[in-house]
């Protein structure tokens, strides 16, 4: 399969300056770095391709050879000429990966995996906060070898293949390039007597109970990070983190939108027409709500400070009650008679006055049909 053009890989022109090459490399390296894409083989392959293009184009001699001969400049047997790249990657990797991934790449490669635990909360628990205890299976540091991976009383020895350097020199066309040592895999040392308890990995699988304090005001999708509670790292590497993801169950009464709570409050016909006081639910108890006379369905009443407290700002949200005027059902004969009498009183001009929205609607309907017949 033909290799891609190095300039195309970095997205730069053939006249790009060293600064433009570095800028393009930093941007792409951060995006496709294996530490940001764990287990993604396509991203890992792309990262190697980007690094190769950068190494060639930043070195004046390699770039000149590539511009003249293309990829054939690096094929085995092309020439007896040999030189080693002096390109300094320390500044690039320090700038790009120092802040994002940490400074010690060897320890980073041994870092334990992050874990995620999904926890379900009721709305009350999410709003008020609560302590929970969870049990998770994970890789913990071996207590026999203290995470070192070797039998107690023994020590690791320098790798004889790379002389403890972690890398070996390989010939590639014009150049000598460094590759990770296949014997020690870049670790510089070889464990001759691995720990029997953890098979030389420095960690074993076991379940752990962890207490979590859920702060008041969390919402769906929020994550709580517990530093160092992920899986133990390989051979003494640092532990990963545990992320607790919040899922809030649906509530039978309240709906939540950010820091506000919403609920529907049914009221009867008489209460809507004449007004009065009712009690409505809130998460901290019942609250009195005054219904004005002539209240219509859909009217919102705001009860300040009865919502959810923001974790970040401390602002307290509101409770919004939407009134629904309920049509009476299962009427007695007396109630039907009274309602008929009331309905008769709405006929004529008095009815138009009592039901202005009905009058406006039917006036509009009349104009609509009059327009069709004209």
From Swiss-Prot:
CXXCXGXG motif repeats lie at residues 142-149, 159-166, 181-188, 195-202. InterPro entries: DnaJ, DnaJ_C, DnaJ_domain, DnaJ_domain_CS, HSP40/DnaJ_pept-bd, HSP_DnaJ_Cys-rich_dom, HSP_DnaJ_Cys-rich_dom_sf, J_dom_sf. Zn(2+) 2 binds at residues 159, 162, 181, 184. Gene3D superfamilies: DnaJ domain, Heat shock protein DnaJ, cysteine-rich domain, Urease metallochaperone UreE, N-terminal domain. SMART domains: DnaJ. GO terms for molecular function: ATP binding; heat shock protein binding; unfolded protein binding; zinc ion binding. This is Chaperone protein DnaJ. It comes from Wigglesworthia glossinidia brevipalpis. The gene is dnaJ.
């Amino acid at each position: 399969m033909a290799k891609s053009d190095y300039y195309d890989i970095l997205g730069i022109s053939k006249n790009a300056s060293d600064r433009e090459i570095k800028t393009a490399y930093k941007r792409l390296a951060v995006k496709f770095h294996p530490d940001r894409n764990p287990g993604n083989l396509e991203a890992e392959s792309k990262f190697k391709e980007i690094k190769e293009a950068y190494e060639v184009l930043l070195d004046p001699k390699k770039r000149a050879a590539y511009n003249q001969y293309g990829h054939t400049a690096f094929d085995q047997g092309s020439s007896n000429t040999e030189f080693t790249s002096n390109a300094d990657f320390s500044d690039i990797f320090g700038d790009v990966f120092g802040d994002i991934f940490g400074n010690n790449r060897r320890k980073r490669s041994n870092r334990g995996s992050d874990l995620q635990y999904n926890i379900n909360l009721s709305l009350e628990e999410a709003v008020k906060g609560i302590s929970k205890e969870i049990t998770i299976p994970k890789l913990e540091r071996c207590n026999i070898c203290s995470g070192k991976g070797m039998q107690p009383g023994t020590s690791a020895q320098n790798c004889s293949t790379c002389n403890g350097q972690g890398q070996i020199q390989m010939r590639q066309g014009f150049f000598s390039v460094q590759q990770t040592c296949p014997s020690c895999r870049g670790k510089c040392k070889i464990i001759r007597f691995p720990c029997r308890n953890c098979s030389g990995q420095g960690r074993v699988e076991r379940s752990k109970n962890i207490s979590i304090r859920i702060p008041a005001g969390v919402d769906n999708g929020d994550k709580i990070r517990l530093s160092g509670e992920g899986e133990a790292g390989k051979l003494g590497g640092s532990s990963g983190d545990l992320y607790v993801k919040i899922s809030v169950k649906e509530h039978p009464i309240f709906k939540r939108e950010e820091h506000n709570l919403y609920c529907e409050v049914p009221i009867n016909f008489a209460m809507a027409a004449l007004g009065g006081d009712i009690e409505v639910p809130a998460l901290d108890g019942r609250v009195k709500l005054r219904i004005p006379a002539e209240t219509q369905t859909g009217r919102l009443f705001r009860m300040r400070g009865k919502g959810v407290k923001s974790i970040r700002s401390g602002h307290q949200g509101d409770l919004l009650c939407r009134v629904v005027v309920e049509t009476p059902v299962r009427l007695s004969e007396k109630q039907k008679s009274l309602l008929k009498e009331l309905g008769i009183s709405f006929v004529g001009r008095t009815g138009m006055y009592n039901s202005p929205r009905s009058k406006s609607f039917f006036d509009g309907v009349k104009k609509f049909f009059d327009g069709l017949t004209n």
